[in-house]
From Swiss-Prot:
A Pfam family recorded for this sequence: HrcA
Top-level lineage group: Bacteria
Family of this protein: Belongs to the HrcA family.
Reported function: Negative regulator of class I heat shock genes (grpE-dnaK-dnaJ and groELS operons). Prevents heat-shock induction of these operons.
GO molecular function, one term: DNA binding
Gene3D superfamilies: 3.30.450.40, Heat-inducible transcription repressor hrca homolog, domain 3, Winged helix-like DNA-binding domain superfamily/Winged helix DNA-binding domain
Protein name: Heat-inducible transcription repressor HrcA
Originating gene: hrcA
InterPro entries, per database record: GAF-like_dom_sf (IPR029016), HrcA (IPR002571), HrcA_C (IPR021153), WH-like_DNA-bd_sf (IPR036388), WH_DNA-bd_sf (IPR036390), WHTH_transcript_rep_HrcA_IDD (IPR023120)
S-S bridge residues: none
Keywords in alphabetical order: Repressor, Stress response, Transcription, Transcription regulation
SUPFAM superfamilies the record matches: GAF domain-like, Winged helix' DNA-binding domain
């Protein structure tokens, strides 16, 4: 990724301010209207005070440098992946230089603090709706969660409920049939003494000697072994409505995101954006993907991705994505400190 940025920066040094404005205008117009952009159109929608011939010469240079291309003779120009990357980088600069625009986004205030699944569901649907993209959110790994409390609740002479409550409000519950009359309150107290503050992973790895081989360890293993989808998704219908994508494009995407290693390869430091060929899969060259992590304190606990057509509003989408990641990190950090 750094090599790509270095090459782009070297190419940008060959452009003067006017040519950068022309390129910016072409990309913005194409994103808005999804039609090739002519030199005349550049003059109509910009404040560039030069002749159409000058703009055409600039467009030839931009084409030579790989920022735009002409689909056929006498047509306007269309941005390449490199041109879209330029637009995205320019948007980042503008965002840093100006005060952040107010985003019409909902907050998480109405969602109970003890319901992380609802928080992730809300975040995914909000991100999909505002970006018109397809969203994948990785759930926190259950094995990394700290145990807050264990409960043994008798419900009849023969049955009791075994419950584990972890940070973020994630709980696992199972009924137990028992024929023994034991002091369940004392057993619950001892279990809490042993388990509270430990991660589920530590327990399952046998780090608590007194639990090794016990029925309770087997119960915990069976509870955590319950199948939970690693990712929740939202917004597939947005891609189906996008006129720049075909059903085949969408099928290709759905097939590729099944590959866990592929998804992990998309994540870098901070927010990473890959456009077209930068994704590294030929059958995904019509897409752009934004990826990033959300945190508990300083520790990353999950990744978020959203895929959209590469002809998209990079400026707005970057702000929205950053907002969602920050809110998720705030939520999981504050919940873990309760």
């Amino acid at each position: 990724m750094r090599r790509l940025n270095r090459k782009n920066n070297e190419a940008l040094k060959k452009l003067n301010d006017r040519q950068r404005k022309v390129l910016y205008c072409i990309v913005r117009e194409y994103i808005e209207n999804k039609k090739p952009v002519s030199s005349q159109r550049v003059l109509e929608v910009s404040n560039i005070e030069f002749s159409s011939a000058t703009i055409r010469n600039d467009m030839k240079k931009l084409e030579y440098l790989g920022y735009i291309y002409q689909p056929h003779t006498s047509a306007g120009r269309i941005p390449t992946d490199k041109g879209l990357r330029f637009y995205y980088e320019e948007m980042l600069k503008i965002s840093k230089e100006t005060s952040e625009a107010d985003l019409a986004v909902e907050t998480f205030k109405s969602v109970p603090l003890a319901d992380p699944e609802k928080i992730l569901f809300l975040a995914g649907n909000l991100l999909a709706r505002l970006t018109q993209g397809y969203v994948l959110i990785e759930r926190p790994n259950t094995r990394d969660l700290k145990i807050l409390r264990v409960m043994l609740i008798p419900v009849s002479e023969d049955y009791l409920i075994f419950s584990i409550l972890t940070e973020f409000g994630v709980s696992r519950v199972t009924p137990i049939k028992t024929q023994e009359r034991l002091n369940w309150e004392e057993i619950e107290r001892q279990l809490n003494f042993l388990l509270r503050g430990r991660t589920i992973g530590e327990v399952l790895m046998g780090k608590i000697e007194s639990l090794k081989g016990s029925g309770f360890l087997r119960l915990i293993e069976s509870l955590i072994g319950e199948t939970v989808e690693r990712y929740l998704d939202a917004g597939l219908e947005n891609l189906l409505k996008d006129e720049t994508l075909t059903l085949e494009d969408i099928r290709n995407l759905l097939e590729e995101v099944k590959d866990q290693k592929f998804l992990e390869s998309l994540v870098g430091e901070g927010i990473t954006v890959r456009i077209g060929r930068e994704i590294g899969r030929k059958n995904l060259e019509k897409f752009a993907v934004f990826s990033g992590r959300y945190f508990k304190g300083e520790s990353p606990i999950g990744s978020v991705y959203f895929f959209t057509s590469k002809v998209t509003r990079y400026d707005r989408n970057h702000k929205i994505f950053e907002y969602i990641l920050n809110r998720l990190s705030e939520y999981f950090t504050s919940t873990s400190r309760r």
